[in-house]
Amino acid sequence: MTELCDIAFKYKTDKCPQIKHHFTEYYHEIFKDKRESVRKVVEIGIGNMTPGIVGASLYMWREYFPKAEIYGFDINKDILFSSYRIQTFFCDQTSRKDLYDLIYHSIRDGVDIDLLVDDGLHTPESQIYTCKMIMPFMKKYSIYAIEDAGYANTDLLIDEYDVEVFTPGKRRKFKDDRLIIVRQRG
């Protein structure tokens, strides 16, 4: 287990293998040497469908990235909150206006996002639409992560961006146990 797995388990987010997915292992590999330099993390989908802390992964990111501002977006207005270095906002990720507001208004100058995690509606259509709307505004070395992704997403994104698919192999227990990492080319 990685340090991020332990932090995720502490907050009861399903991103860690102790609860459900192995995403935190992969995130740790990407960011373990960059933790101090990450300044802005955005997550779409902050609700918790299992018992635990609403916004659990936002608290996880805040602890893992000690200098980052954390922004969460959700379609459920009843779960929005703010806390030290965490702000949350309403966003319907199927709405062009809401995604535009996410980039330009809510997080003030979206181009400096280091990590954006789509853990929102979990439909291929919303995942592809959101990625195609936001990726052009992200800086060159940003990471755009699509959690709980279907295989169809890769084919639709691969022509425009560098795409890497993470599946935990033999450990995979859930059909949604798939993470797609999208990066700008070049």
Predicted segments, located by residue:
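A short alpha-helical cap/connector motif
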Residues: 1-117, 121-146, 150-186
